């Protein structure tokens, strides 16, 4: 199916690109989320008339994401979890825990934005975590997991 991208889609293309994708991907994901439209002649003409407006909107979204990333970059986030004597946690620190800690500090992030390269954190110490705010913008923070002794 031929579609017009209404925003940048990772591994697919930029705003305004006409690309061919599988029917299911277009019908079930891209079109319902507003990331694409069917590439009919009428849709292409409508897109071209609104192109400048859409590009400005995307630029504003990118600028807002860069501003949020500048605030988040290098942040040291502390999370306390029960741990044994050897520094191994009872349970783990997941992206939901990191989301809650960031919201407590006043940052609005969604759980799906948090990328943990080694999976959930199961050891006391400092761990690098990436927050992907936009397809082009990522902020790197350090999550410091503190062990809480169990009596």
From Swiss-Prot:
Which terms under GO biological process does the entry name? Answer: translation
The entry's keywords: Ribonucleoprotein, Ribosomal protein, RNA-binding, rRNA-binding
InterPro entries registered for this protein in UniProt: Ribosomal_bL9, Ribosomal_bL9/RNase_H1_N, Ribosomal_bL9_bac/chp, Ribosomal_bL9_C, Ribosomal_bL9_C_sf, Ribosomal_bL9_N, Ribosomal_bL9_N_sf
Q: Which domain of life is it from?
A: Bacteria
Q: Name one GO molecular function term.
A: rRNA binding
User: Which Gene Ontology cellular-component terms appear in the entry?
Assistant: ribonucleoprotein complex; ribosome
Q: Which residues form a coiled coil?
A: none
Keyword Nucleus, does the record have it?
Answer: no
Pfam families reported in the protein's UniProt record: Ribosomal_L9_C (PF03948), Ribosomal_L9_N (PF01281)
Keyword 4Fe-4S tagged: no
Concerning its family, UniProt says: Belongs to the bacterial ribosomal protein bL9 family.
Q: Which HAMAP family does the entry mention?
A: Ribosomal_bL9
Role description: Binds to the 23S rRNA.
Q: What is this protein called?
A: Large ribosomal subunit protein bL9
- Taxonomic lineage: Bacteria, Pseudomonadati, Pseudomonadota, Betaproteobacteria, Nitrosomonadales
